[in-house]
C-alpha cells in the first residue's frame, strides 16, 4: 500500500495539511519535506528510534519522515524524569532519540532536528531546495507531486502490519507497558472515528493534546488518511484557543474535560464553526454536560486506550442528553462485551477489532491480556439494554471493603456536587478490620468539616460506601492528558 502522505500529495496536494498559525504546509509541501528528511534519517541506520518532540510542524514532518524511512517511532512523554525515559527506551532496545526539544539523557545518542537540517545544507524545513537534487514544486492543478522527488530513492509503500508507533501506558500502577501500534491499527481506529464522530476533507481540526500521546497522534493519522487540515497548537491557553475557535473556522477539537471547562469559563458559550468537540481522558460530570448542551456545544464523549489506538466508544450529544454517564456505543468495526457480569450487569469490558494491538512489546510475559481474541481492558463497565456503555472504574481501582465492591467514581460524583468542592477523588485506604475503606481527597477553597461531608454523603450513598477518611488538598495529580494519577495518592 502507498504511504498515506504520498497518496495525499498526489490526489490532494494543494490542500493545507498542517498550520500553526504562522506557517502552513500543503500535502505536497509536507510530503516533499518529509521525503528529504527521510533521506537523511536513513543514514543513521536505525529501525526504531525514540522521539522527544513538541506539538509543532517540525515534529509532524519528523514523524512522517521516520515512516517514509521505514523507522518505528517510540513516543516519549516529555514530562517524564530522565530515569523513566531511560527505562522505557531500554525496555524496547532504543539507542537513538530524535528531538525537536533540548534533551540530555546519558547512554543514548541524542540528535536534534536542527542539527540534521543544517548538517550538509542539502535539507531545510522551510521549503529550500536540495542542492544535489532538482526538486521543483509544480503548482498546476494537474500534477501535484514534486518533480524529481525523492520517491525514486525512498520506498513509497508500506505494510499495514508493520509497527508505526510505540507508546507506553500511563503506568499509574505497576511497570509501564510498551504498546506497539501498527499502521493497520491506526487505520482501523481512524475509520471507526470517521463513522462514529464524522469528519471529511473540509475538516479543520485544532490539535492541542500532546502528539506523544495517542489522543494527539491519532488526529495526525486521521488527517493524513482523510486529507483534512490540522491546526497544531503547542500549549493550551484558554484565551488563545477561544480566539482561534472564533476566527479560524475550527470545525473539530480534541479536549479533556477540564480544558473544556476552562474554555466555557473563558466565554465559549456558542459553537461558532465547531461541529465536533471530542472529549476523553477523564469522566464527564453531569453538570458540565448540562452546561455545554445549554450552550449548544457539540460535545462527544469518548473512551479509548493506548492499546486500542484511541477511541472505540463514542457518545453523541443526544446520547449524553439521555444518559449523561455513558461513553456511548462502539464503532461499527469493533465488538465489545462484558466478562463475568454480576447481578447489576457490571463486569470487565472486553474489545475485539483491527484497532487493537497484537500484544505488548514489554513486558513479554503478561498473561490474561487476551481471551478468545478479545482484549481485556481492565475496566469495570456495563452495557445497558439500548447498547449504551457505562465505564465505572478501573478494576485495579475498585475498593473491596469487607467483601463489598465499592466504585470510587460513584463516591467522587456525589462529593463533587457538594457546594464548594471543585474536585475530588476516592481511593482505598488500608484497614485492619475491613481490608480497605474509602478515603476521599478533595479540593476546596472553603472550610468543610468531616461531619458536614459525612452528613451530605449519607443522603446519597449506602453506609458502607461513606469514606472513613477525608483529606483536603490544594490540587490533585493529573497527567498531561488529564488522567488522574491515583498511585500518587495511594502512596500519599
Swiss-Prot record:
One biological process term in Gene Ontology: menaquinone biosynthetic process
Catalytic activity: 2-succinylbenzoate + ATP + CoA = 2-succinylbenzoyl-CoA + AMP + diphosphate
A GO molecular-function annotation: ATP binding
Domain of life where this protein originates: Bacteria
InterPro entries per the UniProt record, alphabetical: AMP-bd_C (IPR025110), AMP-bd_C_sf (IPR045851), AMP-dep_synth/lig_dom (IPR000873), ANL_N_sf (IPR042099), ATP-dep_AMP-bd_enzyme (IPR050237), MenE (IPR010192)
Record key words, sorted: ATP-binding, Ligase, Menaquinone biosynthesis, Nucleotide-binding
Membrane spanning stretches: none
PANTHER family per UniProt: LONG-CHAIN-FATTY-ACID--COA LIGASE, NONRIBOSOMAL PEPTIDE SYNTHASE PES1 (EUROFUNG)-RELATED
Name of the featured protein: 2-succinylbenzoate--CoA ligase
Originating organism: Staphylococcus aureus (strain bovine RF122 / ET3-1)
Source lineage: Bacteria, Bacillati, Bacillota, Bacilli, Bacillales
Gene name of the record: menE
Amino acid at each position: 500500500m502507498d504511504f498515506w502522505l504520498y497518496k495525499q500529495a498526489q490526489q490532494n496536494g494543494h490542500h493545507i495539511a498542517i498550520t500553526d498559525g504562522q506557517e502552513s504546509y500543503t500535502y505536497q509541501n509536507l510530503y516533499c519535506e518529509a521525503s528529504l528528511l527521510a533521506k537523511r534519517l536513513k543514514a543513521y541506520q536505525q529501525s526504531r528510534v525514540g522521539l522527544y518532540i513538541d506539538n509543532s510542524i517540525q515534529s509532524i514532518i519528523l514523524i512522517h519522515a521516520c515512516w517514509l524511512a521505514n523507522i518505528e517511532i517510540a513516543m516519549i512523554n516529555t514530562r517524564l524524569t530522565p530515569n523513566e525515559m531511560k527505562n522505557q527506551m531500554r525496555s524496547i532496545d532504543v539507542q537513538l532519540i530524535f528531538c525537536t526539544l533540548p534533551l540530555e539523557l546519558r547512554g543514548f545518542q541524542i540528535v536534534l532536528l536542527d542539527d540534521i537540517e543544517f548538517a550538509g545544507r542539502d535539507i531545510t524545513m522551510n521549503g529550500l531546495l536540495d542542492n544535489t537534487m532538482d526538486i521543483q514544486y509544480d503548482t498546476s492543478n494537474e500534477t501535484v507531486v514534486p518533480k524529481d522527488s525523492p520517491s525514486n530513492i525512498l520506498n513509497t509503500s508500506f505494510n499495514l502490519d508493520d509497527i508505526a508507533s510505540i507508546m507506553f501506558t500511563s503506568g499509574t500502577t505497576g511497570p509501564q507497558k510498551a504498546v506497539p501500534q501498527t499502521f493497520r491499527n491506526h487505520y482501523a481506529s481512524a475509520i471507526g472515528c470517521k463513522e462514529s464522530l464524522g469528519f471529511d476533507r473540509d475538516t479543520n481540526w485544532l490539535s492541542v493534546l500532546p502528539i506523544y500521546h495517542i489522543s494527539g497522534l491519532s488526529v495526525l493519522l486521521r488527517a493524513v488518511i482523510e486529507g483534512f487540515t490540522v491546526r497544531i497548537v503547542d500549549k493550551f491557553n484558554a484565551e488563545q484557543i477561544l480566539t482561534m475557535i472564533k476566527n479560524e473556522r475550527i470545525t473539530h477539537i480534541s479536549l479533556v474535560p477540564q480544558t473544556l471547562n476552562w474554555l466555557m469559563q473563558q466565554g465559549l458559550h456558542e459553537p461558532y464553526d465547531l461541529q465536533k468537540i471530542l472529549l476523553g481522558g477523564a469522566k464527564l460530570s453531569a453538570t458540565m454536560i448540562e452546561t455545554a448542551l445549554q450552550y449548544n456545544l457539540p460535545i462527544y464523549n469518548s473512551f479509548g486506550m493506548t492499546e486500542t489506538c484511541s477511541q472505540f466508544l463514542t457518545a453523541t450529544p443526544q446520547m449524553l442528553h439521555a444518559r449523561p454517564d455513558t461513553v456511548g456505543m462502539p464503532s461499527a468495526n469493533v465488538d465489545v462485551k462484558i466478562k463475568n457480569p454480576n447481578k447489576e450487569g457490571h463486569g470487565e469490558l472486553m474489545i475485539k477489532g483491527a484497532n487493537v494491538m497484537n500484544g505488548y512489546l514489554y513486558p513479554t510475559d503478561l498473561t490474561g491480556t487476551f481471551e478468545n481474541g478479545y482484549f481485556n481492558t481492565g475496566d469495570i463497565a456495563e452495557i445497558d439494554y439500548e447498547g449504551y456503555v457505562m465505564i465505572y472504574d478501573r478494576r485495579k481501582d475498585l475498593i473491596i471493603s469487607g467483601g463489598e465492591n465499592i466504585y470510587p467514581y460513584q463516591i467522587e460524583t456525589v462529593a463533587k456536587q457538594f457546594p464548594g468542592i471543585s474536585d475530588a477523588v476516592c481511593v482505598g485506604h488500608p484497614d485492619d478490620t475491613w481490608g480497605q475503606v474509602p478515603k476521599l481527597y478533595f479540593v476546596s477553597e472553603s472550610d468543610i468539616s468531616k461531619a458536614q461531608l459525612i452528613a451530605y454523603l449519607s443522603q446519597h450513598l449506602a453506609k458502607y460506601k461513606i469514606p472513613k477518611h477525608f483529606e483536603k488538598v490544594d490540587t490533585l495529580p493529573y497527567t498531561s492528558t488529564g488522567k488522574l494519577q491515583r498511585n500518587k495518592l495511594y502512596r500519599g
